[in-house]
Regions:
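Flexible hinge/capping segments at coil-to-helix
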Residues: 2-38
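C-terminal effector-binding regulatory domain of bacterial HTH transcription factors
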Residues: 89-97, 107-168
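Residues that form or flank phosphate/diphosphate-binding pockets in enzymes
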Residues: 24-25, 42, 49-50, 126
Length: 168
């Protein structure tokens, strides 16, 4: 039984080499994206299920040619011309990735939420509380302790429903 505490939301972007046909579009839609091979995260890791859901909602099937658990591997595949990358927007390094073009995909895919999880009933040491509050400032010791008193994950989610999480 896990307690899952929300930390921040994150969004996806598309990554293409300079000169790619998608770069010329003012706004990429899901039908445009479906015309190209995709390189993205492994299913069940880092929000891949949201990509599949977005295509499913449009009645389309994504053409995924490679998957990886690491954004840098995906960037390498994009650089090799193997497909359009679909990665977390925060994985782009403005200094290192100057050969690639980042295209907004917030309108295509719902954001995901990064959470800190731990087993219910675990003894949380002071350094664990410290880490949580450093990683996500709204996860104060009081809030974490309140979450621990909740009986269900739904109750935990409701506890944090008024907290405005940052977007990264």
């Amino acid at each position: 039984d896990l307690v899952m505490l929300p930390c921040y939301h994150w969004t996806r972007c598309l990554l293409v080499p300079k000169g790619h046909p998608l770069e010329a579009l003012e706004r990429v839609d899901i039908e445009d994206l479906a015309r190209f091979p995709l390189v993205t995260y492994t299913f069940g890791f880092t929000g891949r299920s949201e990509l599949d859901s977005a295509f499913s909602r449009a009645g389309l099937e994504p053409h995924i040619v490679f998957t990886a658990i690491d954004a840098d591997v995906i960037k390498t595949y994009v650089r090799m011309g193997l497909g359009v990358g679909v990665i977390a927007s925060m994985a782009i390094d403005e200094k290192e990735d100057t050969d690639l073009v980042k295209l907004d995909a917030r309108h295509l895919f719902q954001s995901s939420t990064t959470k800190i999880c731990f087993r219910r009933g675990i003894f949380l040491r002071a350094y664990m509380y410290d880490f949580m509050s450093l990683f996500a400032p709204h996860l104060t010791r009081d809030m974490v302790d309140k979450a621990l008193t909740m009986k269900t994950q739904y109750d935990v989610d409701m506890l944090f429903s008024d907290v405005e999480l940052p977007v990264r």
